């Protein structure tokens, strides 16, 4: 189990009430006078934005997921200066997201994809990976994740409650990520599971065009991309290594190019 999965399992136990109590205890003290409370989704986001934002001006708090963030933001904005940074996910492809002056969204699917969408940063990143024995092609990995990512988009748009965990575990292991492979391994975490047929999925693909530059960076999430790059590395690197290198190479000058910064 990688570091991200460990923190994900811990974060699943966090509730909005516990989170509000924790914030009240940690943020409301004289050391944070004048600071803006900034909510981020998870541990990886916390590490990234802690490096990018001026610590003396902000107090960054992980909310252990977007559902908790959505629940507590309306309460917190009434009490103190508060902003939230949330993954845009499929926002550019029709997914409904909260509209609020206090809610900011990543330029692309998440912070990882927003960083890698920049040509200069992506070139530096791939060069460092190559120096560490991981000579991979991001474009190939993105293309291979196309069907799975549209499957996930379909699930979000229609709330089909599909459990992708069995497939997610195979992204770094299997040669093909086609419809048959995906459909054969997905499960359901509720009785409301809907069987997404091949024809239905193709209908979603046709009906959800995105007139955006680098649309694949809106469609694919960073977790899946890193796992696919692990597959193409032949086991040379793992997801934690890829994530750590992205954080290590990210500079304020990179962050300042993003619409999120402005």
PLM-predicted stretches and their roles:
Residues 1-262:
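Acidic, divalent-metal-binding catalytic cores of TOPRIM
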